[in-house]
């Protein structure tokens, strides 16, 4: 509604010189095959030509593109040759970290970004990184290369989480099955929060090791209990995070 005169216009140079009045519209994006997260964004229409996304964050993997970015849903099918990082994000009180943004970097370069769903589940899916050579040792003749099966990459992790930015009126109940469309620009504009290595939130987590051919599932260590010193570390089902302060 509101674009009737525009849709019947000639669309030529003279038409655009008359500066047809613009109105704000909310666009909702949903994938029936559940490959990508649902979201919404506001756009001023009409626009001349193809609409160009104007709010791609700095250092985005898509920084040279003007298309609207989409982010994988946890239910997306994984294709060959792709690396996967998963997490189920929670605050200390057990509240799902809905719409939190997780970023992974390797050697300072952003390799993937994901947005959590309303239950805090998130996945980053990206092409497998280039194989790494082992560092040179002395003498140089003893230098070796890591075999393909032993390849791994140390990723730097950042969480962007500012739940108050998504205040809706009225709020959608957590148990509701109604589809929710978080504002994409707001999601990407969230400030940096904290990732916790342990459930007691005494140690922050900033890195994780991705191994070739294996999904990396990020989880916080469970609280320590009396057990033999050589017992295996117990992990929670969740990766605990805190909002930006």
Predicted regions and their residues:
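Beta-strand-rich domain onsets/edges
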Residues: 49-84, 90-95, 114, 217-244
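Short, ordered, surface-exposed loop/turn motifs in non-cytosolic proteins
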Residues: 93-107
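Short, acidic Ser/Thr/Gly-rich low-complexity loop/linker segments typical of extracellular
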Residues: 1-10, 109-131
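Exposed beta-strand and adjacent loop surfaces of beta-rich binding modules
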Residues: 24, 84, 98-101, 154-156
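N-terminal accessory interaction module
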Residues: 1-56
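A short, solvent-exposed beta-strand micro-motif common in secreted/extracellular proteins
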Residues: 23-33, 133-141, 150-163
């Amino acid at each position: 509604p509101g674009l009737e005169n525009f849709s019947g216009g000639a669309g030529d140079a003279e038409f655009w010189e008359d500066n047809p009045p613009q109105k704000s519209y909310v666009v909702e994006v949903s994938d029936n095959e559940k490959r990508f997260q649902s979201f919404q964004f506001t756009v001023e229409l009409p626009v001349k030509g193809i609409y160009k996304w104007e709010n791609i964050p700095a250092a985005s993997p898509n920084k040279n593109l003007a298309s609207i970015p989409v982010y994988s849903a946890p239910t997306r099918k994984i294709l060959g040759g792709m690396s996967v990082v998963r997490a189920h994000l929670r605050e200390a009180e057990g509240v799902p970290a809905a719409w939190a943004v997780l970023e992974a970097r390797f050697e300072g370069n952003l390799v993937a970004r994901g947005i959590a769903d309303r239950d805090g589940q998130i996945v980053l899916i990206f092409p497998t990184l280039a194989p790494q050579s082992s560092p040179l040792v002395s003498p140089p003749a003893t230098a070796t290369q890591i075999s393909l099966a032993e390849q791994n990459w140390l990723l730097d992790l950042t969480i962007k989480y500012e739940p108050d930015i998504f205040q809706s009126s009225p709020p959608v109940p957590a148990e509701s099955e109604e589809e929710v469309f978080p504002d994409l620009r707001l999601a990407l504009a969230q400030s940096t929060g904290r990732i916790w290595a342990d459930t007691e939130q005494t140690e922050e987590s900033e890195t994780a090791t991705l191994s070739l051919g294996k999904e990396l599932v990020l989880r916080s260590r469970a609280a320590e209990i009396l057990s033999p010193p050589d017992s295996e570390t117990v992990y929670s089902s969740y990766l605990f995070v805190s909002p930006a302060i």
